[in-house]
Structure formats: structure tokens, C-alpha cells
Design a protein with these regions (language model features):
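Extracellular low-complexity Ser/Thr/Asn/Gly-rich intrinsically disordered segments
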Residues: 3-356
Length: 356
């Protein structure tokens, strides 16, 4: 075993004939040349793709690692090949035929061996690259966002807060950025995002949610429906009138008296009655019959008509009116007639006391 002293060294070989008894010999020079193996990057970056088919497999372009592996070496002087195991890489056997479009054979994570060979000396070096298939964000289908047609009633457009859907979509997941789009194409390309408050362009309207992993950049999309529900159309009722027996402006009312007229045949409507507009708007502190008015003579209460399915409501006013009772004199003069036939009965004209 001889250890070289330099990359290129001359040694001498003595050749002596062993068949003769003389000491005759000759010698020749032997030049020993030691070529370096390629000095490559032995820790190249991972190659990552997104798991578009959710099966752990993806399409990789292995050549994307070429520049990093060569680490400054002239690519025209070296040949790079890829292998699925170390033995093949060492023996230059069974290279990956399509490194520009390679599908991993081990789901999610796989090691690939890289062989870099000098085109002149045939010296080579090997390293590995890691392939990673990143999972897509899991987005949960949200329920539609529903608004009532309160602004410009009848135009079926409202201003939506799109972020109201995020909690349902993520279900507590973190590290996922959510954005909203009008088309699937925009969602896929991450172009033309829309923002809150967002006014729908049709009723109902489907928009698209993109959830992107903050680290891997992998994304999923899902749809979100926007709906504008009509508000009830209660009829304005006639005043409810009750007699005021003591003429103090107060009495008891049956506030539900006009319920059928107010609902006017509309389905899925429930009514509640309130002393103030604020209470009616908030659906709190309803009043029930018999109701004793708190404003003398004439009082306005507020009727909330609410759809039991959508929760949308409208409010109409209901007037309560107290009617004064006739005031009778404390003493009315007696009507006296004669009992001509002495039988205790007679005919009386009661109208003669009308003016009294």
C-alpha cells in the first residue's frame, strides 16, 4: 500500500530480469494522478409540494435542486442523476428517468439520492434531498350568512361581515390565513380579494373562501353563500278603543285584538307588543293582555312582527284609545203618573228625562 504525497506524483518502476544471473535492470516512470471528488452541497434544502389530491403523493421537479447541490460548480462539467436508494446512486444504476416530473413512492416524506459526476474524471460524490408532501388546510363548510333586508327594503342587498364565517370554517385551527373572493379562479390565483363590509351583487350569492397555511403556502378553498331575507309586511292596524268607565283616561286593553289583521295571512309570523320602539327593536319586555295604558286617552304601543324561520322583523304602531263614558246627573226627578184603574200598573214615557 502506497500513500501518495501530492495530487500528481511521479514514481519509478524498476524492471529486473529474474532469469539471468546478472544484475541487469531497467526502469520506467509512473505518474500517479489523484482527482478530487466533486465538492457539492451535502445538505440541500427540502423539496416541498402541496398534497392536492390529499393522498400523500405529489409531483416533484428534482432538477430544482441542481444549482444548490452543485454549490457553484460549472453545470456543464458535471452530470447530475437521481436515485431512489443509496446503492443505486453509488453504482450509477436505475436512475430516475423523469427527474423533471417525479412522483414520490413513499407518501408524505421520501429521501432521494443525488449523484454528481465529473464529466472528465468520472469522479463522483453523492448527497440526499428530502421530498415533503404538505397537507392542505382542512376547511369546514360554513352555514350561509343571512341578513335581513333592512337597508333599502326590497332591493335584496345588504352589507355582510364576511369574517363572521371564519370561526365555523377553521374550527379552532391556527396558522391559516383566510381571504374571500367572488370567483373560484380568483381564489385559486389569490387575486382580487374582497373585504368587509361586502355588499352582495345577487341574492343569493356564492363567494369563495381561501385558507392558506402560513408556513407551507398550501391552500384549500370552500364556498360561502350570502342570503338576504325579506322582512315581514305587517298591516297597520286600526285603533283599539275601550270605554273609560271613570273617565280618567285609563282602562284595560286586549292588545292582541287586531292580531289577525296585522299578520294579514303571512306565514311563519309571530307578534309581540311593546311599550317603546327600543324594546320592540330588541324584542324585550313584551306586554300582555289585559294591558293598562300608561298614557291617558291615547297611547301608541309597538307591534313587532317576526318571522320564526329567519328572525327578520318589522314594527308597526298600534294606537290605544280610551272612550269617555256618558256622565249622568246624580239626581233625576221622579216620573209620576196616576193609577186610574187602581191596579198598580201604568204606562211611563221615559224619554221625557233624556235632557236630564
Amino acid at each position: 500500500m502506497y500513500k501518495r504525497q501530492a495530487y500528481e506524483q511521479t514514481i519509478y518502476v524498476r524492471v529486473e530480469d529474474t532469469t539471468i544471473t546478472t544484475d541487469c535492470f531497467s526502469y520506467v516512470e509512473l505518474i500517479i494522478i489523484v482527482n478530487d471528488v466533486p465538492q457539492i452541497n451535502t445538505e440541500p434544502s427540502y423539496l416541498e409540494v402541496c398534497d392536492d389530491n390529499t393522498d400523500g403523493f405529489g409531483l416533484f421537479d428534482l432538477s430544482l435542486s441542481n444549482e444548490e447541490v452543485l454549490d457553484g460548480l460549472d453545470p456543464s462539467e458535471f452530470t447530475i442523476t437521481y436515485y431512489e436508494n443509496a446503492e443505486n446512486a453509488e453504482n450509477a444504476e436505475n436512475p430516475i428517468i423523469t427527474p423533471f416530473a417525479y412522483t414520490n413512492v413513499t407518501p408524505f416524506n421520501q429521501t432521494i439520492w443525488v449523484r454528481v459526476e465529473n464529466n472528465t474524471t468520472n469522479c463522483y460524490n453523492t448527497t440526499t434531498i428530502e421530498l415533503t408532501v404538505n397537507e392542505l388546510p382542512v376547511l369546514i363548510q360554513p352555514t350561509p350568512l343571512n341578513l335581513c333586508d333592512y337597508i333599502n327594503t326590497g332591493d335584496e342587498t345588504e352589507e355582510f361581515t364576511l369574517e363572521d364565517s371564519i370561526e365555523q370554517v377553521l374550527q379552532g385551527q391556527t396558522g391559516i390565513n383566510i381571504s374571500f373572493y367572488e370567483t373560484q379562479e380568483d381564489a385559486d390565483n389569490d387575486t382580487n380579494p374582497i373585504f368587509s363590509p361586502y355588499t352582495n351583487t345577487s341574492n343569493a350569492q356564492t363567494i369563495y373562501i381561501r385558507g392558506e397555511n402560513e408556513i407551507t403556502g398550501c391552500y384549500s378553498t370552500i364556498t360561502l353563500d350570502l342570503r338576504v331575507n325579506p322582512i315581514p309586511s305587517p298591516a297597520v292596524p286600526q285603533a283599539i278603543e275601550e270605554c273609560d268607565e271613570d273617565n280618567d283616561g285609563f282602562t284595560f286593553f286586549t292588545v292582541e285584538q287586531n292580531e289577525v289583521d296585522i299578520i294579514n295571512g303571512e306565514l311563519d309570523i309571530v307578534l309581540s307588543y311593546h311599550e317603546t320602539l327600543t324594546n320592540a327593536e330588541n324584542g324585550i319586555e313584551p306586554i300582555i293582555s289585559p294591558y293598562y295604558n300608561i298614557v291617558p286617552d291615547s297611547q301608541i304601543i309597538f307591534v313587532r312582527a317576526e318571522n320564526t324561520i329567519t328572525g327578520c322583523f318589522s314594527i308597526v304602531e298600534q294606537e290605544l284609545v280610551t272612550l269617555p263614558s256618558p256622565e249622568l246627573p246624580l239626581i233625576i226627578e221622579d216620573i209620576i203618573v196616576c193609577d186610574d184603574d187602581y191596579d198598580g200598573t201604568a204606562i211611563f214615557d221615559l224619554t221625557q228625562r233624556d235632557e236630564d
